[in-house]
Amino acid sequence: AQWQPYAPHGFTVHVNLSPRQLADANVVPLVRHTLARHGLAPERLGLEITEGALMDDPEVAARTLEQLSELGVQISVDDFGTGYSSLAYLQRFPFDTLKIDRFFVSRITEDPKTAGLVRGIVGLADALGLLTRAINALGADSLGLFAHLPLGVRPHLLLDSELLLEVMAD
């Protein structure tokens, strides 16, 4: 949590939560303990869940995600649109953010159908009160791609942790 004083307002660290971790009865106490141990404000942590992780036991997943949400951490649907996309999941689970997979983002300038899908996903997320993030690895082409995204979509850059600390310190 050394980076928190340097981080811009609203900056969060996102961690993938595996299906096994989501099903683990100790995941909520573990997240609570980890936040306290590292002095990390809950709103600075985002937990990312793939849609497939929700399928094994939706009842347990719903309870666990609700408890994690109550801690104040952000809950994101990771790689939205590439797996078992069910609109019912968006209604049933306490998600804060939809992350549009880089498969779509990388093709947004080349394919009108892909651009239409991204606009549709953004509109759906907006109607449900969810943030939308577009995934792309940090690179020279990132800004060009993000310029083509609909308004309201936040870039979600994949950064190396050492690079992140270096950027924050500057």
Language-model features: locations:
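Conserved N-terminal phosphate-binding loop of PLP-dependent enzymes in the Aspartate aminotransferase
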Residues: 117
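Catalytic core regions of nucleotide second-messenger enzymes
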Residues: 5-11, 39
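Alpha-helical scaffold within the catalytic cores of cyclic-nucleotide enzymes
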Residues: 1-6, 122
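N-terminal low-complexity segments that are often proline-rich with Ser/Thr-Pro
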Residues: 134-170
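Conserved protein-kinase N-lobe ATP-binding Lys motif
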Residues: 19
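The catalytic core of metal-dependent phosphodiesterases that act on cyclic dinucleotides
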Residues: 29-108, 112, 122-140, 147
